Amino acid sequence: MIIIPARLKSSRFENKVLEDIFGLPMVVRCAKNANLVDECVVACDDESIMQTCQKFHIKAVLTSKHHNSGTERCLEAAQILGLKNDERVLNLQGDEPFLEKEVILALLEATKNAPFMATCAKVIDEEQAKSPNLVKVVLDSQSNALYFSRSLIPFLRDAGMKRQTPLLGHIGIYGFHNKEILEELCALKPCVLEELEKLEQLRALYYQKKIAVKIVQSQSVGIDTKEDLQNALKIFSPNLL
């Protein structure tokens, strides 16, 4: 099951999930991409999103406005839907309208092999890595996440030093091996790291849970601001979606 948490009043770009992407609301575009891989449900926090999904025949459920993260919203949706404890759950974002089907498939495959949860990342350049809106991730020897940060990591202390490994930009999608793991993660108390960086995935690392990271090729960009949307619409052609 793929669940897309969709919040209306995003702090940086209010109502963004309803913004038009070549004739379709952003969240609808995301859901249509997801439905190419598996059954998808949008977890809404507002009737306006719910009605938009229904208009375009996208399955949706109404959840609380008071969740602290998209993961918590996914869990409520899974409970409303009555998902079985052993069902895998993918958490995609309502602000990734250009996410390729191949990336979702890669996440699904990685989730099957991950004992706890999985996510994806892509190689980025130094200029891209400077943006705090593009989260960076560093990996251990087994391709599990060591840390996620809005800062540039790893930092090169010595001038002239060359990077031994590529910079990796996190793609904010998650796969949970089963619903019970989603419940386990949401039951953990928020940690100071996730509150400082505003990155919910740091809770799992803080409590020593493994996040497997699949490196993929992707041109997708997350839409965090109005500027992101304007730039993306210039880059992507409606014929490619």
Curated annotation (Swiss-Prot):
Keyword Ribonucleoprotein (UniProt): no
Metabolic or biological pathway, per its Swiss-Prot or TrEMBL entry: Nucleotide-sugar biosynthesis; CMP-3-deoxy-D-manno-octulosonate biosynthesis; CMP-3-deoxy-D-manno-octulosonate from 3-deoxy-D-manno-octulosonate and CTP: step 1/1; Bacterial outer membrane biogenesis; lipopolysaccharide biosynthesis
A GO molecular-function annotation: 3-deoxy-manno-octulosonate cytidylyltransferase activity
Entry keyword Nucleotidyltransferase: yes
Record keywords, A-Z: Cytoplasm, Lipopolysaccharide biosynthesis, Nucleotidyltransferase, Transferase
Places the protein is found: Cytoplasm
Entries under InterPro entries matching the protein: Cytidylyl_trans, KdsB, Nucleotide-diphossugar_trans
GO BP annotations, alphabetical order: CMP-keto-3-deoxy-D-manno-octulosonic acid biosynthetic process; lipopolysaccharide biosynthetic process
EC code(s) of this entry: 2.7.7.38
A GO CC term attached to the entry: cytosol
Reaction(s) this enzyme catalyzes, per UniProt: 3-deoxy-alpha-D-manno-oct-2-ulosonate + CTP = CMP-3-deoxy-beta-D-manno-octulosonate + diphosphate
Functional summary from the UniProt entry: Activates KDO (a required 8-carbon sugar) for incorporation into bacterial lipopolysaccharide in Gram-negative bacteria.
Family recorded in the similarity comment: Belongs to the KdsB family.
Protein known as: 3-deoxy-manno-octulosonate cytidylyltransferase
Organism field: Helicobacter pylori (strain Shi470)
